[in-house]
A protein has these predicted regions:
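Metallo-beta-lactamase
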Residues: 1-54, 101-116
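Glycine-rich, charged/polar anion/phosphate-binding loops
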Residues: 51, 61-62
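A short catalytic or substrate-binding loop motif that flags glycine-/basic-rich loops and adjacent residues
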Residues: 56-60
Length: 152
């Protein structure tokens, strides 16, 4: 991702508008302060039960997070899967870096999750419909992903 946000990709407006200049500058600052690490493998196990998987597609460095919870493995897909419909139909989100990797990322996300009921999309409103908040105070903000979703 760093190659993308500091390189020729940013000469294309559709890519550039997705990033804030100050955020890119902050990442470069962190790099110079030796406070930034890069994942260089396709799969990065950062702690027991926590794995990052590089899938690419939407962006050059798109990753998903696989976490072992009380109910087993789940995948936090972030922008790799904006909406569940994308996985179900293999119809991509409108902005992507690499179409083939985006479709493959849908398949990888679903396979690593073990089913749609263990895949958490990045932007689908169904997520807040299917999972309760951890408390009333956090309704619609912090969800309990340890339980099975209430899919209608």
């Amino acid at each position: 991702e760093m190659n993308s946000i500091t390189g020729p990709d940013m000469t294309y407006t559709p890519f550039r508008v997705a990033y804030h200049k100050r955020d890119t500058q902050k990442l470069v600052d962190l790099l110079y302060e030796e406070r930034l690490s890069f994942f260089t493998e396709t799969v990065n196990k950062v702690a027991p039960g926590i794995e990052f998987h590089l899938v690419g597609g939407h962006s050059r460095g798109q990753m998903i997070l696989r976490i072992h919870t009380k109910r087993g493995w789940i995948v936090l897909a972030s922008d790799a899967v904006h909406l569940y419909e994308e996985v179900e139909t293999e119809r991509p989100f409108s902005i992507f870096h690499d179409l083939q990797k985006m479709i493959a990322g849908y398949r990888t996300s679903l396979q690593l999750a073990g089913g749609i009921n263990r895949l958490i999309s990045g932007h689908d409103p169904k997520v807040t419909d299917w999972y309760p908040a951890i408390s009333n105070e956090f309704e619609g903000q912090l969800l309990d992903l340890n339980i099975h979703p209430q899919m209608n």
